[in-house]
Amino acid sequence: MKILWISPWFGNYRIPVYENLNKLSGGNFYIICSQENTSDLVREKLKATLGDHAVIMSGEKRTTMGSEESDFANSALVIKRQPGLYKAVKDIKPDIVITEGFGGWAPVGIRYAVLHRKKLCIFYERTAYVERNSPKWRSWYRRIVGTPVDHFLINGTLTEEYLNEGLHFRKTPKVKGCMCADSFGLSQAVAKVTVEDKQALRDELGLKDGLTYLFVGQMVERKGIKELLHVWSKHIETYPNDNLVVIGKGILLDTMKELYDRLPSVHILGAINYDLLYRYYALCDVFIMPTLEDNWCLVIPEAMACGKPVASSIYNGGHYELVKDGVNGYNFDPLKESSILETLEKFHHADLEAMGKKSVEIESDFTPDKAANRIFEACKKVFGKC
């Protein structure tokens, strides 16, 4: 059973999943990706993991309609074409083709599976909320090209609901839990941080002795950082010793620093090398993600693996599976000022240590090996129907 995954873009978190799939398939796992859309580090790790089974293509052609200035979903239509992609797929001769969604490079994989009567799986992450502004023609397109799909590989319940109710794929099999974060190395590094190490970093940043909340993400509109910073000054009226550490880069970075650096409790650090991020995860009491739109926010399970209570936006598609109110954190609406303030306050009355332990327990079901196992079992099921 030869499996091919066509994925133009992915981050480091996917490498362990691919590695496990290759082991499970007995070395019969292949991937085709884009040179332009992946980082040097990702490609280096991919080649070290899969060798010649990783096909890296270049020269992608893009046609854009609409504005790409916004990073919200459906703000623009981008049509992608990769010269030589169909031939590359044909040369591998896969028994099962996995595509990323319905667009991008997916039509080539779908075409191959249909013409050669091979099995087709689609890895899908979108939710009804993320697709709230999707035009009707796009939904019709997805319904049509998704007709031959044998199995959907999805992240969670909200994606399942969208596929069933929004796109009417109720009868097509689906397996949840196919998304994960590569959090093992991060959690191991956090576990080694000493009390003295934490205090040294606290002194370096000039933190007060209240709770420390951590945000890690892009400094863009979609991540809700503006909404969080806007209400912070009201939060510290009640809890003046609390701290907010903000890590990330993006178009809002300079503006946010200009507006909020005057607050002694706000520490906007900009980009931090990934190899040093563990220090800040170890330092914080609570991790917070106020995103206004996300399929499955990876930093939430990363923080959970590090034993942290989490505050998640209800617009994060992963909140349904990952964040249990009052158990390992709280969900909130970042578009409502009162919701943010109430959530920040709740952690002052919670057992943070117990919440952190629950975070680890919940996240343990969303590891790369478990995601790979679910995907491989789905592949075996559809292949068995040949």
Regions found by a protein language model. Name each.
Residues 292:
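Aromatic "clamp/platform" in nucleotide-sugar-dependent glycosyltransferases that forms part
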Residues 309-313:
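Short hydrophobic beta-strand element within catalytic cores of glycosyltransferases
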Residues 4, 207-223, 229-232:
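Conserved donor-binding/catalytic core segment of Leloir-type glycosyltransferases
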Residues 147-198, 208:
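Donor nucleotide-sugar binding/catalytic pocket of nucleotide-sugar-dependent glycosyltransferases
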Residues 118-136, 148-151:
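A short, histidine- and acid-enriched strand-loop-helix "catalytic/donor-clamping" loop
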Residues 271-272, 279-284:
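Short alpha-helical donor nucleotide-sugar binding micro-motif in glycosyltransferases
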Residues 254-272:
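Nucleotide-activated donor-binding/catalytic signature segment of Leloir-type glycosyltransferases, i.e.
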